[in-house]
C-alpha cells in the first residue's frame, strides 16, 4: 500500500509540519545514526531498552524513544483531546510542547492533544541539537544554524557528530 502525504488531503498540512520538524532534528538524528553504527543501539527503541529496571515499561507498546533522550508518545486515537503518557522512572522529563515543563519520572500524566500534536518529552541531562535553518532534503541541504536544547541536570556531555556529508575524510 502506498502512503504518500498528498493522499491525505485533509491532513496534508499536519503531515508537512511533521516532516519539517523531522528535518530540523537532522543533527540529532545524524548523531544517533553515528552512535548506532558504533554501538548497535537502535535509533528508535522501546522504553524497556533504556529502562529495564522500571517494570511499568514492560508492556508499553505505543511510546518509544527517539535516540537516547526523546520520548515520543504519538496521538493514535482519532479525535483524542488528551493522551496519557507514562514517563519512565529514574529521571525527570521535560515536556517539549509545554515550555519544557518538568515532570518527575515514574508516573503517568495526562496531557492535552490535538491531531497536530506530537507529544515529546526530553530526558533530563539531554542536549538536543537541531537545525535552526529549514532543511528540505537530507542530501542537498546542510545545517548552517544550530540550536541546542538543554534539559538541565548538573554537568552533562554530549556528542554531536558532523562531517562533510560526502566523503569519509572524518576517519
What residues fall within each predicted segment?
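Catalytic core of carbohydrate-active enzymes
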Residues: 1-171
Amino acid at each position: 500500500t502506498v502512503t504518500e502525504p498528498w493522499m491525505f488531503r485533509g491532513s496534508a498540512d499536519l503531515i508537512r509540519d511533521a516532516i519539517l520538524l523531522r528535518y530540523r532534528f537532522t543533527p540529532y538524528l545524524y548523531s544517533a545514526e553515528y552512535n548506532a553504527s558504533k554501538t548497535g543501539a537502535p535509533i528508535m527503541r522501546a522504553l524497556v531498552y533504556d529502562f529495564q529496571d522500571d517494570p511499568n515499561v514492560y508492556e508499553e507498546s505505543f511510546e518509544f524513544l527517539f535516540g537516547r533522550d526523546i520520548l515520543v508518545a504519538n496521538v493514535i486515537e482519532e479525535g483524542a483531546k488528551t493522551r496519557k503518557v507514562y514517563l519512565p522512572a529514574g529521571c525527570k522529563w521535560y515536556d517539549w510542547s509545554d515550555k519544557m515543563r518538568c515532570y518527575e519520572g515514574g508516573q503517568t500524566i495526562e496531557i492535552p492533544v490535538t491531531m497536530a500534536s506530537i507529544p515529546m518529552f526530553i530526558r533530563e541531562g539531554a542536549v538536543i541539537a537541531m537545525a535552526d535553518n529549514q532543511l528540505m532534503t537530507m542530501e542537498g541541504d546542510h545545517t548552517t544554524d544550530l540550536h541546542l536544547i538543554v534539559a538541565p541536570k548538573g554537568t552533562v556531555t554530549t556528542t554531536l557528530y558532523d562531517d562533510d556529508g560526502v566523503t569519509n575524510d572524518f576517519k
